[in-house]
Amino acid sequence: MFSHMAVMYANALYGRGFVAKGFEALDAIYQQSVDFETSRMYPGIPEYFSQRGRGMYPYLTGSASWYLLTLVTEVFGVRGELGDLVLMPKLRSEQFDEKGRATLHTLFAGRRLKVCYKNPEKLDAGEYGVGNVLINGQNITCTKAEGGVKISRLELMQLPDDVHCLDVVLREKK
């Protein structure tokens, strides 16, 4: 398996709404990479896996960066759009912890953000939408975007230089 293309394929699946298949592709790469007995690799994603499942050439790959890009922008759905922050999660129910949370730490517009999705009903991708968003415990006004919400860059730029908690409550689509 050529890892770089497999990750890009997963990215495209997520981008076109095939969340279950995208998850399956990313999870297969991850499971193969962490199976040291078979892959004979230190943790990481190699350029490709041989027919025996052995990882080959860990230093000739952009797979890990594409994997992370896919996790941030597609799975967690955290990305920029014309300077504003868009939150459009595609997390599967099994990706939330026992309390129904999934958290990502990232940078956006020079601000350190802790994005915590709260899925109290343990809904699967496609079953939920963004209900409300809080920054540091305060409700904020968001613009609805297809499949998520948009937060104004200006609102984020007014925040002091610190880590800011974005609590994103997911609700069943109606």
Residue spans for each PLM region:
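Non-catalytic C-terminal accessory modules of carbohydrate-active enzymes
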Residues: 8-174
